[in-house]
Amino acid sequence: MNSKIFAVLLLLALLSCVLSDQYCPKSSITACKKMNIRNDCCKDDDCTGGSWCCATPCGNFCKYPTDRPGGKRAAGGKSCKTGYVY
């Protein structure tokens, strides 16, 4: 009986996570000098602890998702490299 209750609670918790929309946070920076552009990540797998790889004017950084839209996830791709981009 206890295992059935636990299974139902676990299913409800997973369902609420899947149904809630998550976004990269909106960047407060609108522009960045080219010499300061740096990528800490290129894809979500480069980030730890449930954070996402999000694009900003100053590069890609690992950020925790938020429920407010406005940010942009990093596109990644073969041309993306970590470190300074200049």
Swiss-Prot record:
InterPro entries, A to Z: Elafin-like_sf (IPR036645)
Keywords: Antibiotic, Antimicrobial, Disulfide bond, Secreted, Signal, Toxin
N-terminal signal peptide: 1-20
Post-translational modification: Contains 5 disulfide bonds.
One annotated Gene Ontology cellular component of this protein: extracellular region
Source species, domain of life: Eukaryota
Keyword Disulfide bond: yes
Domain WAP: 21-66
Disulphide bridges: 24-54, 32-58, 41-53, 42-80, 47-62
Main location: secreted
Tissue spec. comment: Expressed by the venom gland.
Gene Ontology terms for molecular function: toxin activity
Claim: Endoplasmic reticulum is one of the keywords in the record: no
Intracellular or extracellular location(s): Secreted
Gene Ontology biological-process annotations: defense response to bacterium
Family recorded in the similarity comment: Belongs to the venom protein 11 family. 01 (wap-1) subfamily.
Function of the molecule: Has antibacterial activity.
The name this protein goes by in its record: U15-lycotoxin-Ls1d
